[in-house]
From Swiss-Prot:
GO terms for biological process: 'de novo' IMP biosynthetic process; cobalamin biosynthetic process. Its EC number is 6.3.2.6. This is Phosphoribosylaminoimidazole-succinocarboxamide synthase. Belongs to the SAICAR synthetase family.
Length: 237
């Protein structure tokens, strides 16, 4: 196993492996907010996100949705296909919350009849600004056909995840996706899907089961992530 670091982000490190085109992802215990301005470490967070992401990506694969995920290899690590990340954060919104509620002057919790898909330019120095299709084309991030493919994939993923989280008695409020191109130019789902990247509310109590408990100081992060993992395991068995 090689320890040559390829990339380090806020929540993960990527390392080379002996196999060409395969990387090792190591999940960190760090949690960040305000685009990295606020940072804390929570013992066990990396393990929780690795397990949750591994289960969700496996579930998506069973539904016919391809991703970079290969398999988990330890409590905090997984193997993934190497992709070139497209610098877009793709946000799918099913319920008004967060920045969208503020931007549109709506109350949090208002259902969105047809999910809204948004693009954000993945650039920390600019605080990941909201952009439209014309910006994407101007920045040469993706072609029109690729944007259509990404949107369709995001909506397909949303459908599968909504059904999954409903079984867990959780409302999928919104979530962030990232995509990458493999060596052949195919677009694959990448990054992670976890309470770090999703807003999740308990269907009965509206308790927040995601990183908002850290952002807003309203609960224990590892407790709610553990709750999500336990519910996920129950419906997967």
């Amino acid at each position: 196993m090689t320890n040559e670091l390829v990339y380090e982000g806020k929540a993960k490190r990527l390392f080379k492996t002996e196999e060409a085109g395969v990387l090792r992802v190591a999940y960190k215990d760090d949690a960040t907010a305000l685009n990295g301005v606020r940072k804390e470490s929570f013992a066990g967070k990396g393990e929780l996100n690795n397990q949750i992401t591994s289960l969700i990506f496996s579930h998506l694969a069973e539904a016919g949705i391809e991703s970079h995920f290969i398999r988990a290899i330890s409590e905090t690590e997984q193997l993934v296909k190497e992709v070139s990340i497209i610098p877009l954060e793709v946000v799918v919104r099913n319920v008004m919350a967060g920045s969208l509620a503020k931007r549109l002057g709506k109350e949090e919790g208002e259902p969105i009849p047809n999910a809204i898909v948004e693009f954000y330019f993945k650039e920390d120095a600019l605080d990941d600004p909201f952009i439209n299709d014309d910006h994407v084309l101007y920045l040469e991030i993706a072609t029109t056909n690729e944007m259509d493919e990404i949107r369709q994939a995001a909506r397909s993923i949303n459908k599968v995840l909504q059904e999954l989280f409903t079984q867990m008695n959780i409302t999928l409020i919104d979530f962030k996706l990232e995509f990458g191109r493999d060596a052949a130019g195919n677009i694959l789902l990448a990054d992670e899907i976890s309470p770090d990247t999703c807003r999740l509310w308990d269907k009965e109590t509206n308790q927040k089961l995601d990183k908002d408990v850290f952002r807003r100081n309203i609960g224990n992060l590892t407790d709610v992530y553990t709750e999500v993992l336990n519910r996920l395991k129950q419906v997967q068995n």
